[in-house]
Amino acid sequence: MTLAFQLAVFALIATSLILLISVPVVFASPDGWSSNKNVVFSGTSLWIGLVFLVGILNSLIS
């Protein structure tokens, strides 16, 4: 269970870093938002899901 929690936290941190870099790039590029809207929404949905997963796993561990 601890390994699953650690992997979920790592995935959350990695996803956060990827979104931290990619979202401003998408907004700054001309025509970037209209062509990459689905990718940004998918990444954001993944991030929200990982936040809930980490919270649930944290409550099971402690």
Curated annotation (Swiss-Prot):
The chain crosses the membrane at residues 8-28, 41-61. It comes from the Eukaryota. One of its GO terms (biological process) is photosystem II stabilization. It is found in: Plastid, Chloroplast thylakoid membrane. Disulfide bonds: none annotated. The keyword Plastid applies. The keyword Thylakoid applies. This is Photosystem II reaction center protein Z. It comes from Nicotiana tabacum.
